[in-house]
UniProtKB/Swiss-Prot annotation:
Disruption phenotype: Dwarf, narrow leaf, sterility and small grain phenotypes. Keywords: Cytokinin signaling pathway, Two-component regulatory system. It comes from Oryza sativa subsp. japonica (Rice). GO terms for molecular function: histidine phosphotransfer kinase activity; protein histidine kinase binding. The gene is PHP5. Functions as a two-component phosphorelay mediator between cytokinin sensor histidine kinases and response regulators (B-type ARRs). Plays an important role in propagating cytokinin signal transduction. It comes from the Eukaryota. It holds the Pfam family Hpt. This is Pseudo histidine-containing phosphotransfer protein 5. GO terms for cellular component: cytoplasm; nucleus. Gene3D superfamilies: HPT domain. Transmembrane segments: none annotated. One of its GO terms (biological process) is cytokinin-activated signaling pathway. Residues 38-140 form the HPt domain.
Length: 152
């Protein structure tokens, strides 16, 4: 496949991630930190995000089992995940973390459970979408990494 076409596909996928609310401007700022010395910076940061966020979610699941209805503990775990999402630009996951924290504030265990399932689902969908995006960028080569979606 032609490299220009791959770059267009990557740009289109990135735009759709913004249009669908998966990403926010923070992700562009992460990508802007890439340079010739570290052309895979954004992909490496995203990889670390998923490694860390997966660990946080596993710790959270353990906290739910060991400390049922300990809303303060649950909120602390979710705040950590929300912060990670904010720093990488994972907008939909971050927004669901906010919903979860609201349920914690209401001490609504059922709402927390439903919201956490949404967090996990959004996290999994974003992982798949980002994997597709970075795969296209790797195929296109370094010149395909510096495109900012229109209007962002």
């Amino acid at each position: 496949m032609e490299y220009g076409n791959l770059r267009r596909q990557a740009a289109s996928l990135k735009k759709s991630l913004f249009d669908q609310g998966y990403l926010d401007e923070q992700f562009c700022q992460v990508e802007d930190l890439q340079d010739e010395a570290n052309p895979n910076f954004a992909e490496e940061v995203v990889s670390l995000f998923f490694k860390d966020s997966t660990r946080v979610m596993l710790n959270f699941e353990q906290a739910i089992e060991k400390h049922p209805k300990d809303f303060a503990r649950w909120d602390t775990h979710m705040q950590q995940l929300k912060g990670s999402c904010s720093s990488i630009g994972a907008s939909r996951v971050k927004n669901e973390c906010t919903s979860f924290r609201n349920f914690c504030g209401e001490e609504n265990a059922e709402g927390c459970t439903r919201s956490f399932q949404k967090v996990k689902r959004e996290h999994a969908v974003l992982r798949q979408k980002w994997e597709s995006y970075f795969q296209l960028l790797r195929q296109a080569g370094p010149a395909g990494t510096a495109t900012r979606p229109a209007g962002k």
